[in-house]
């Protein structure tokens, strides 16, 4: 039997408010994270991802208090990321109620941190977030590069090779965001999603660019992702999680 594919609403949190931008800029307020998380829990979301988007840039720690409040209201797996740099950061988030912790910038500066975290807490707790941007030109073999610091700093790292390295170090999941598509609402970058999903044995969560329900299904059917993540289409009431699940089921995708 095929494993059910997950639908994951994503809360990008900036100074305690859920926000949504386009290509990591032009931020728009979407509300209180705990209220929004509770709504998705009631709608039947499979998981929730909470990313403190100010954390890495400002060098401050993820808001543990918000995570505690959210975990007390939400009874589905909660992944939290943003500014996670140390084993103690991970322990604090898990103690606050996170089920999984997402590591992004710190993995690039210290890849062994991912291995240490997986050894300490188990691979099932460790998500590596990858922000990728296409860097190949027309007529060239497609190539995507890893960027850090909310998509501001190029690293020179090849996204597919990097994802393989993270899997080898013990990451349990990859959260893949296409920076070219983020907030654009014209679909995932299916090329990079498929390239990484096909190269790995661990689940890949597709993120960045969902504008309609067909895009969610495409992430699974064409991108070969194990889960699809979206923000704007849910936050601003365009679609509900049950509508998304019904549409995906109508396309032959197994959902919970």
From Swiss-Prot:
Protein family according to the UniProt entry: Belongs to the HisA/HisF family.
Record GO terms (molecular function): imidazoleglycerol-phosphate synthase activity; lyase activity
Official protein name in the record: Imidazole glycerol phosphate synthase subunit HisF
Assembly mode: Heterodimer of HisH and HisF.
Pfam families referenced in this protein's UniProt entry, alphabetically: His_biosynth
UniProt keyword annotation of Lyase present: yes
Phylogenetic lineage: Bacteria, Pseudomonadati, Pseudomonadota, Gammaproteobacteria, Pseudomonadales
This protein's encoding gene: hisF
UniProt keyword annotations, A-Z: Amino-acid biosynthesis, Cytoplasm, Histidine biosynthesis, Lyase
GO cellular component, one term: cytoplasm
